[in-house]
């Protein structure tokens, strides 16, 4: 480490600390009102739908109305013609204090997810639904704005981080959890864009601009949008697929290259553009991969890959057994950074979750922190 820090000291543009690339949940929560307050401020009713339950209540107000079925739910819009009409007037409760949620225009949200995504639709006709769906009544433009947010990655990501029960005890969000998500107050310009985008998606099903719009509404930085995507791609996929998750997939050369590109971009922003160590990956047959940064050699612009060295394979296999720990049938595999005289070695399992964008950000920040500590 001393030789490395002497090399690092040559860079004039170094600064004292690196900004941690994390999704600032506290800032998000303090910047915008919760959905609950947002709805209250705009005079919008919200509640879960009716419950059949014990059927002790007879109510004729829903006779002949279309019923939205959670099992046949579609995002953004559902034509009235595809729904069955209600012919049963017995209930346990009918959300009597919030009957406007069944009147058009209204937003209906499915509280359970489909492959990590939540769905909401805005309907321009009266319809009823049961307590597995959440209804919101209010001004139509606001409903379409909220519909875009609920259908977006940001909505799923927020609840992935904050929900007490989703993917732990149950597959659905509780209404109370849904109401905690921060909602930015839209300007007239944002509302116009939201309506335009909603109508575009409703008409042709093209959702390619959805997440970019919502990222912009929440003023997320580029790296935050990547963190959101990584979390849903890897964390949710792990909950869903378990051992078959892409999180455990062997990284491709492209994955390693993308990791290295992000990793070096962050380090150069911290240490200066003159920080150009020679870099190489060892990706043989062992369960571990190694990124080697040779501080004393300048990068010739090429990222090298090696995959066949018997002594290295033997060493990595032994190291893997030392880094793998079993506790109560849970396997823990540790990551290692080794600081040699002239080189830095980053040793991690050969699984995609350790070589994605989020990992590159975290590794670069931790490496920078180690260097700063060594500098004193």
Predicted features along the sequence, with ranges:
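Non-catalytic DNA-recognition/assembly elements of restriction-modification systems
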Residues: 2-51, 63, 68-73, 184-376
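Short amphipathic alpha-helical patches
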Residues: 91, 132, 136, 169-181, ...
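Hydrophobic, well-ordered secondary-structure elements that form the walls
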Residues: 109, 152, 181, 218
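Short, charged/polar micro-motifs that form catalytic or ligand-binding hotspots
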Residues: 95-99, 136-140, 168-171, 180, ...
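Conserved structured core elements
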Residues: 29, 103, 127-130, 140, ...
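Short, ligand-facing micro-motifs at secondary-structure edges
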Residues: 75-80, 110-129, 144, 148, ...
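Polyanion-binding catalytic cores of nucleic-acid enzymes and NTP/SAM-utilizing transferases
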Residues: 1-135, 139
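Basic, amphipathic alpha-helical recognition segments used for DNA target recognition
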Residues: 134-180, 187-190, 351-376
């Amino acid at each position: 480490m001393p030789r490395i820090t002497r090399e690092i000291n040559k860079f004039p543009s170094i600064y004292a600390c690196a900004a941690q690339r994390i999704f600032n949940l506290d800032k998000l929560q303090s910047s915008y009102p919760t959905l609950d307050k947002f709805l209250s401020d705009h005079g919008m009713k919200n509640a879960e739908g009716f419950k059949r339950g014990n059927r002790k209540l007879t109510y004729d107000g829903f006779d002949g109305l279309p019923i939205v079925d959670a099992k046949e739910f579609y995002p953004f819009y559902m034509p009235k013609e595809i729904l069955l009409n209600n012919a049963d007037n017995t209930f346990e409760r009918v959300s009597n204090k919030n009957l406007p949620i069944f009147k058009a225009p209204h937003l209906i949200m499915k509280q359970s997810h489909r492959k990590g995504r939540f769905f909401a639709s805005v309907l321009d006709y009266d319809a009823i639904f049961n307590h597995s769906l959440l209804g919101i009544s209010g001004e139509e433009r606001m409903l379409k704005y909220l519909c875009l947010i609920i259908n977006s990655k940001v909505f799923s990501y927020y609840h992935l981080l904050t929900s007490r029960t989703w993917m732990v005890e149950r597959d659905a969000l509780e209404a109370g959890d849904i109401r905690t998500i921060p909602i930015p107050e839209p300007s007239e310009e944002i509302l116009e864009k939201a309506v335009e985008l909603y109508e575009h998606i409703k008409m042709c099903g093209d959702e390619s601009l959805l997440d970019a719009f919502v990222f912009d509404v929440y003023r997320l930085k580029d790296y935050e949008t990547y963190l959101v995507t990584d979390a849903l791609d890897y964390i949710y996929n792990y909950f869903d697929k378990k051992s078959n998750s892409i999180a455990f997939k062997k990284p491709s050369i492209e994955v390693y290259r993308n990791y290295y590109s992000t990793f070096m971009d962050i380090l150069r922003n911290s240490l200066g553009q003159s920080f150009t160590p020679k870099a190489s990956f060892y990706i043989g047959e062992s369960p571990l991969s190694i990124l080697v940064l040779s501080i004393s050699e300048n990068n010739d612009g090429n990222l090298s890959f090696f995959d066949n060295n018997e002594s290295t394979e033997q060493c990595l296999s032994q190291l893997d057994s030392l880094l793998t720990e079993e506790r109560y049938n849970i396997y823990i595999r540790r990551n290692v950074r080794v600081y040699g005289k002239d080189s830095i070695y980053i040793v991690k399992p050969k699984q995609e979750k350790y070589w994605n964008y989020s990992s590159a950000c975290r590794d670069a920040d931790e490496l920078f922190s180690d260097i700063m500590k060594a500098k004193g």
